[in-house]
Amino acid sequence: MTLPVFFGCAFIAFGPAFALYLFTIATDPLRVIFLIAGAFFWLVSLLLSSMFWFLVRVITNNRDESVQNYLLIFGALLSVCIQELFRLAYYKLLKKASEGLKSINPEEDIAPSMRLLAYVSGLGFGIMSGVFSFVNTLSNSLGPGTVGIHGDSPQFFLNSAFMTLVVIMLHVFWGVVFFDGCEKNKWYTLLTVLLTHLVVSTQTFLSPYYEVNLVTAYIIMVLMGIWAFYVAGGSCRSLKFCLLCQDKDFLLYNQRSR
């Protein structure tokens, strides 16, 4: 059963992200570059947060279990804040690059729209986040058939796969909403992204029940997805045309700057 569990959980966690990459990004080299750059920014944010957390552990040098738990929570909160700071830094970089391309040839619109860049960068953040959070767990599913934690839920791998999926998709939605907030100077939008990110990342410290955490995370994902859909220019009419395959110029395939 270990091999079916491995492939099943892998497809659950990374299947939708791979499909998005294959159909919306892989055909355009420029989008692939922006995706890799977004993944790199997330990696750097992880490196910095790991360094800070390691330094705090060395400085405190306390082996008390309760103190270690507080340090773990502190590390998670710090990591989320640094990730959002790097999302902001990546937006600033993309904005400068877009303005530079427009200044080179102002008569021809060669720069991708910021909404498209928000989607691509968010997917880059999400894929790299999912890989680092789930690959070790996924490798354990190959054998000897246990996660190594006595009394843990038998649905541990399945729950982890669905949680990885929701985090990847949330990064996509967070990216779209975050960039829109930066474009329109709506700082409450950035705060909302930060707070929802904190809730999803720290809810496991508040509740030991996987089902509760998954339901909460998926509710947040649906709400953020609806928000991202509308700020990206979507509407009920465009959604209807898309589902009926009648819209030839739908959202991310529209190359015009909005």
Swiss-Prot record:
Question: What GO biological process terms does the UniProt entry carry, in alphabetical order?
Answer: membrane protein ectodomain proteolysis; metanephros development; Notch signaling pathway; prepulse inhibition; protein processing; short-term memory; synaptic transmission, dopaminergic; synaptic transmission, glutamatergic
The cellular component terms of Gene Ontology attached to this UniProt record, alphabetical and capped at eight, are:
gamma-secretase complex; membrane; plasma membrane; synapse
Keyword Transmembrane helix listed: yes
Q: Which residues cross the membrane?
A: 5-25, 32-52, 71-91, 116-136, 161-181, 187-207, 214-234
- How does this protein sit in the membrane? Multi-pass membrane protein
InterPro entries, sorted = Aph-1
Superkingdom of this protein's organism: Eukaryota
Signal peptide annotation: none
UniProt-annotated location(s): Membrane
Name the UniProt key words of this record, in alphabetical order.
Answer: Membrane, Notch signaling pathway, Transmembrane, Transmembrane helix
- PANTHER family this protein is in? GAMMA-SECRETASE SUBUNIT APH-1
Family classification: Belongs to the APH-1 family.
Briefly, what is this protein's role? Potential subunit of the gamma-secretase complex, an endoprotease complex that catalyzes the intramembrane cleavage of integral proteins such as Notch receptors and APP (amyloid-beta precursor protein).
Q: Tell me, how does this one assemble? A: Potential component of the gamma-secretase complex.
- Please report the name of this protein according to its UniProt entry: Putative gamma-secretase subunit APH-1C
